[in-house]
Amino acid sequence: MTIENEALTLKKRFRGYFPVVVDVETAGFNAQTDALLEICAVTLSMDENGDLHPASTIHFHIEPFEGANLEKEALEFNGIRDPFSPLRGAVSEQEALKEIYKLIRKEQKAADCSRAIMVAHNAAFDLSFVNAANERCKLKRVPFHPFATFDTATLSGLAYGQTVLAKACKAAGMEFDNREAHSALYDTQQTAELFCGIVNKWKALGGWPLVDEE
């Protein structure tokens, strides 16, 4: 691999971090007490031109953990009317996270990256719920950095002057279906496209690769 081609890799682009786009749907705002009900993760890949693209998608509906709080307003907001319905096909937090982390570790290794980093819209919220679930499940091998993230609310505010996901996507020239919004699957896919678009636009403007200083 030439020096020029080496610069056009995920490992080089994000300082060894492997970006993974995540969205969660929950039964409230408190990560310690409120249920995690849905999670989706989208991995990313970089092509030979150094452009970023969505790669693999993994998605789960999740059973409320024992004793979890369920805020009525939150359930109305995300459209999950009955978190205990067998029609949801929900699995435990532990099963969902283990499968997601298995995929992340596999693709992180293939990209020769040292650690995963979460990409999310208002990322502190999503990371707080994932970290709380990790603690409940006593998971030791967690691929994500415990606090560092790429927040697309901040990035889209810089790039497009919009911080709301729907408005940021539209400002970026993307379609956004409000009827599909607040589904972890749909929101993660849209966030992944938004993040890739911002990164690729910055590259097209000459912001990457950096010119090495001698």
Swiss-Prot record:
Cofactor(s) required for function per UniProt: Mg(2+)
Organism per entry: Vibrio campbellii (strain ATCC BAA-1116)
SMART domains: EXOIII (SM00479)
The Exonuclease domain, residue ranges: 20-195
Matching HAMAP family: RNase_T
Pfam family, one: RNase_T
Active-site residues, Swiss-Prot/TrEMBL: H182 (proton donor/acceptor)
EC number(s) per entry: 3.1.13.-
InterPro entries: Exonuclease_RNaseT/DNA_pol3 (IPR013520), RNase_T (IPR005987), RNaseH-like_sf (IPR012337), RNaseH_sf (IPR036397)
Domain of life (superkingdom): Bacteria
Chain sites annotated for binding Mg(2+) 2: D23, E25, H182, D187
CDD domains associated with the record: RNaseT
Protein family per UniProt: Belongs to the RNase T family.
Keywords from the UniProt entry: Exonuclease, Hydrolase, Magnesium, Metal-binding, Nuclease, tRNA processing
Gene it is expressed from: rnt
Protein name: Ribonuclease T
Lineage, top ranks: Bacteria, Pseudomonadati, Pseudomonadota, Gammaproteobacteria, Vibrionales
GO biological process: DNA replication proofreading; tRNA processing
GO molecular function: 3'-5' exonuclease activity; magnesium ion binding; nucleic acid binding; RNA exonuclease activity, producing 5'-phosphomonoesters
